[in-house]
């Protein structure tokens, strides 16, 4: 069963640096079983990154959390790991209504 999570974390090297790291980790994310549905910084604070992540399963979410190499890659990209908060979303949600908005 898929799990959707809202993530909030501080980034110290800017969104574009973070985005380059994410693009370079496409294979790792597929291996773990995760998909980034949304990510962006808040207008008031460009160091506050908000993300919506879909994990294929509880095991995929656990694999993400325990992957030391991926954690270090994210840390090197400016993610302040100690500031991270992940909040599971309930099974009641709506996406892409009335149509998807996509920007890379």
Model-derived regions, located:
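Short S/T/G/P-rich N-terminal loop/turn motif that feeds into the first structured element of a domain
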Residues: 1-71, 76, 80-104
């Amino acid at each position: 069963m898929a799990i959707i999570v809202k993530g909030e974390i501080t980034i110290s090297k800017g969104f574009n640096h973070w985005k380059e790291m994410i693009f370079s980790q496409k294979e790792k994310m597929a291996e773990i079983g995760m998909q980034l549905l949304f990510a962006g910084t808040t207008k008031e604070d460009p160091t506050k990154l908000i993300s919506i992540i879909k994990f294929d399963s509880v095991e995929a979410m656990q694999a993400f959390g325990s992957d030391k190499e991926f954690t270090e890659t994210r840390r090197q990209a400016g993610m302040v790991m100690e500031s991270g908060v992940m909040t599971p979303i309930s099974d009641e949600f709506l996406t892409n209504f009335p149509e998807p908005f996509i920007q890379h």
